[in-house]
Amino acid sequence: MKATFVLACLLVIAAVSHADLLPKRMDANAFRMSFGKRSVSNPAEAKRMDPNAFRMSFGKRSAEQNEQANKEDKATSDKLYDDTKFEEMKRMDANAFRMSFGKRSDAHQAADDQVEYVNDDFSLPEQKRMDANAFRMSFGKRVNLDPNSFRMSFGKRSTVGYNLDARNYFVGLGRR
């Protein structure tokens, strides 16, 4: 029994040594040489992807989807909205949220001053400015006020769910 086991082990060792399972050291230039070559003969199929392709096409639709949407629009002409408007809104402006932070909504403006609001370029910077104490006022408050949220399931003294981001808290607190 032991003899057959030893013979089987020797046979396996001999097979492994001849099989070259461990890769030999690769030529350093082999990878570099093959890097520029295209594996596909047809260059139209081997196009490299544009790095911005996903970002740019996020809000767009493909040509097939556009054709289908146009056919559906023609079939149901009594739609309330136009699909072309959604294609124009491709990406949100990066500053849109920041710009609108300190602004008052139009409803508040109409209620405050009963005068028709004139959109002057002079008045815009005044509205864009954020209240100096707005961040400090919100410092210790709960961020999520939904009673059914996951954060509320922790204990009452848990700091999870509180706005404890102190990066801008001490800005402007220095001597004047």
UniProtKB/Swiss-Prot annotation:
Disruption phenotype: Defective preference between different food odors. Residues 59-79 are annotated as: Disordered. Residues 1-19 form the signal peptide. Residues 61-79 have a biased composition (Basic and acidic residues). One of its GO terms (biological process) is cellular response to carbon dioxide. Keywords: Signal. In AWC olfactory sensory neurons, required for the detection of preferred food sources. This is Neuropeptide-like protein 1. It comes from Caenorhabditis elegans.
